[in-house]
């Protein structure tokens, strides 16, 4: 049986408590420990959108985003990729990296953020600069993480393995 690695995460700032965030992250960790299927955890801050029921809702403060990223890193450890969308927190990207993310996610110079089209992706050069400020570097990757390519019998059709292997750095 082929399995599907995927992304999961939590949306913060919608009325939940810190305890509820921890409980949600612990539930995701328990699921991942059972199935090994979560490639990355996204910690996404709520952004109010016009013409929605939550248009007037307050957005979470930066310290709440940073706290939640740090807790996610503690809960999942260094083996899990932790993401936060860079287009939703302009001007504080080094702080987000320092809180514990190691991946910006699907940033694209070609397509908009379909979930938050009002918040354009940062230019890749700017994102690379701000990532360097935090002592890290920006690197392009496939949507499938190297560890899943390495364990291809479990996660991939065998016919795709050699092609993907040639595209994955460090495998």
Where are these regions (language model features)?
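Auxiliary Fe-S-binding modules of radical SAM enzymes
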Residues: 22-171
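A generic short-segment signal for beta-strand/edge and adjacent turn/coil regions
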Residues: 10-13, 73-75
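Glycine-rich beta-alpha junction loops
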Residues: 12-15, 45-47
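Radical SAM/AdoMet-radical enzyme domain recognition
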Residues: 1-8
């Amino acid at each position: 049986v082929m399995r599907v690695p995927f992304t999961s995460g939590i949306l913060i700032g919608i009325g939940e408590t810190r305890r509820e965030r921890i409980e949600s992250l612990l539930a995701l960790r328990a699921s991942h420990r059972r199935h090994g299927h979560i490639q990355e955890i996204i910690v996404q801050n709520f952004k109010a959108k016009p013409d929605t029921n939550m248009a007037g809702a307050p957005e979470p403060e930066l310290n709440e985003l940073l706290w939640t990223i740090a807790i996610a890193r503690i809960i999942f450890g260094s083996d899990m990729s932790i993401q936060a969308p860079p287009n939703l927190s302009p001007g504080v990207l080094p702080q987000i990296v320092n809180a514990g993310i190691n991946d910006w996610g699907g940033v694209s110079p070609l397509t908009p953020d379909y979930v938050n089209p009002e918040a354009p992706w940062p230019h890749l050069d700017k994102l690379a600069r701000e990532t360097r400020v935090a002592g890290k570097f920006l690197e392009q990757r496939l949507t499938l993480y190297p560890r899943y390519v390495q364990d291809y019998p479990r996660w991939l059709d065998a016919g795709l393995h050699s092609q993907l292997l040639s595209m994955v750095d460090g495998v």
